[in-house]
């Protein structure tokens, strides 16, 4: 329950010392048929955490497709949490959990971040960096300026994520001057009513369209994040999201499957509507959905996720061919492989 760094250390220390573990904070522990629901300790000071230990991973784990090629990539936490509380996101539950305990959102100092990035670059010959920040630009301007100045000591391309509301010409110029190579923006749904009322993302279509239009004129690589499979969402709604992506003409198209994280408002809705087992855990957003919805089947969702980028990028004259990929059998799979090769050659 909550953060695990100090909780795990405390648990292991108690087990090693053969001490009672039932009072370990940030954990609910079942022992002898009784459940001990312990409280939440104060949020971790990110600057106090040690540098990541990458020696436990095989080197091949760090080679990732970033910036249009496979690069030795390091992932670095810039802040933890999010000042927003979208109803489908795990940060919704974490913000609620820590509301009376200092709040969940916090930022790592820029100097601490840069020190770790420099150490990892020198030790592992990093070629690329991915910054973990729910929205890179949703912070004080002074903090961004400090990062840009100190990042000169790291000097490798990096990728960020941001919200459409934070994109303007001034921020784009800052990013271009900093060594930022790419940026991902969350669309999530192309249906504005669903986006606002169900997801809690209070932004209109014009805001999103303007953000992508400004980025299209920049030197930054751009991708759009989408999610399908929300409760109440229909096939028609999903195609609204496809059409919205076609309108912005973004180079990179990412699509995930909605999964109901515990503690979120949308999970509560799914439970109330009987869309899932009460004891079900959220699945892998890249390949699984745990919802059983009357308006669209699991199989249809999985197929639409697979061919979503094809619908976005190919001309509509190809849509009948793409739709055939939704079928079962070898013929549908062979056609999907053929179209995927064409997609790679034309659009990647």
Regions found by a protein language model. Name each.
Residues 136, 190-195, 199-200, 212-237, ...:
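Conserved strand-turn element in the central/C-terminal portion of the radical SAM core barrel
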């Amino acid at each position: 329950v909550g953060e695990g760094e100090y909780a795990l250390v405390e648990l292991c220390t108690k087990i090693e010392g053969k001490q009672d573990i039932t009072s370990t904070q940030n954990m609910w522990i079942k022992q002898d048929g009784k459940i001990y629901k312990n409280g939440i300790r104060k949020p971790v000071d990110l600057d106090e955490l040690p540098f990541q230990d990458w020696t436990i991973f095989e080197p091949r784990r760090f080679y990732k497709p970033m910036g249009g090629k496979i690069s030795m990539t390091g992932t670095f936490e810039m802040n933890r949490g999010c000042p927003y509380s979208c109803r489908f996101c795990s940060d919704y539950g974490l913000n609620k959990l820590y509301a009376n305990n200092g709040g969940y959102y916090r930022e790592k100092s820029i100097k601490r971040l840069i020190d770790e990035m420099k150490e990892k670059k020198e030790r592992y010959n990093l070629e690329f960096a991915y910054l973990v920040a729910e929205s890179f630009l949703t912070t004080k301007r002074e903090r961004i300026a400090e990062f840009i100045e100190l990042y000169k000591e790291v000097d490798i391309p990096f990728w960020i994520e941001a919200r459409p509301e934070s994109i303007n010409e001034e921020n784009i110029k800052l990013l271009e001057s900093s060594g930022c190579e790419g940026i991902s923006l969350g669309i999530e749904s192309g249906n504005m009513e669903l986006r606002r009322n169900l997801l809690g993302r209070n932004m209109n279509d014009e805001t999103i369209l303007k953000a992508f239009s400004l980025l299209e004129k920049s030197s930054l690589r751009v991708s759009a994040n989408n999610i399908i499979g929300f409760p109440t969402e229909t096939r028609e709604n999903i195609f609204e999201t496809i059409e919205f992506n076609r309108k912005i003409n973004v180079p990179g198209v990412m699509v995930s499957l909605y999964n109901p994280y515990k503690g979120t408002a949308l999970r509560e809705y799914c439970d109330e509507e009987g869309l899932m087992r009460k004891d079900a855990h959220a699945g892998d957003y890249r390949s699984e959905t745990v919802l059983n919805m009357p308006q669209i089947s699991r199989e249809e969702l999985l197929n639409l996720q697979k061919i979503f980028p094809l619908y976005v990028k190919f001309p509509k004259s190809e849509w009948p061919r793409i739709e055939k990929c939704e079928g079962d059998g070898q013929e549908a799979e062979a056609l999907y492989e053929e179209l995927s090769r064409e997609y790679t050659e034309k659009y990647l």
